[in-house]
Amino acid sequence: MLPAAGLLWWVGALGALYAAVRGALGLLGALRVWGIGAGRAALGPGLGAWAVVTGATDGIGKAYAKELAKRGMKVALISRSKEKLDQVAGEITEQYGVETKVIVADFGEREDIYDRIRAGLEGLEIGVLVNNVGISYSYPEYFIDVPDLDKTIDKMININIMSVCKMTRLVLPGMLERSKGVILNISSAAGMYPTPLLTLYSASKAFVDYFSRGLHAEYKSKGIIVQSVMPYYVATKMSKISKPSFDKPTPETYVRAAIGTVGLQSQTNGCLPHAFMGWVFSILPTSTVMNLLMKTNKQIRARFLKKKMKEK
């Protein structure tokens, strides 16, 4: 029998070895993705002539649509504003010379919109699906105090969860027939841990992450890549960030980096600064992360409510 001191030494040594091995593997993985890798999946017409992007008129969705068009893919844009859809479609055709198609659909509605989307996509050889459409809270809030809570619950489920499942249901069979295709599901870093004061949003994005990773495991042997994309803050209308920075990139910068991870990571934070933040959070105890998130969101909530009071 080892004396207590000897046992503690071996426990410490094994713990240090585990940490060193984990750190080395993490470093190798990071080099593979951010240093050497350029994305195994050649996102372009070789996967199929068309890319389909939901929530395509702003932010990350618009950036994906333009990046895929730049790679030679025709793009089907789906969003609720016909005016914005036509504007983005015009920009894409003018800049990249590819065919576009617009489908007007409000994902906050019930399931009947999917018959219209199905009809709009009929006959298209779809190689890439970007499930980007999503909504969040207007500001962090305690669940029961969320404004118009019942409506918010319905919309959050319909837009953040139902759309991902239904769009995948429409597009995946055609990909399976050709044994190739890529589905990019835009989740959020808020789905990596329960996020107090954004609880419903966080839970909906955790669903997207689990759905994506499970689907990838089911269909990767059949030539289908499914990726969960989990950004931190990006300078978009939804995030209310107008000035980009190193850790809060423009949608275009973020998407260029994220596309490079396709085929290398089934779950990605998308760009190097966000990957670093994800790594830092991953080594912290869950309780610590949740306490930090609670503190941060309480501060954001207080600032929002104070500003709202001044405007009255």
From Swiss-Prot:
Belongs to the short-chain dehydrogenases/reductases (SDR) family. 17-beta-HSD 3 subfamily. This is Very-long-chain 3-oxoacyl-CoA reductase. The active site is at residue 201. NADP(+) binds at residues 48-77. It holds the Pfam family adh_short. It is an enzyme of class 1 (oxidoreductase). Substrate binds at residue 188. It is a multi-pass membrane protein. PANTHER family: RH59310P, VERY-LONG-CHAIN 3-OXOACYL-COA REDUCTASE.
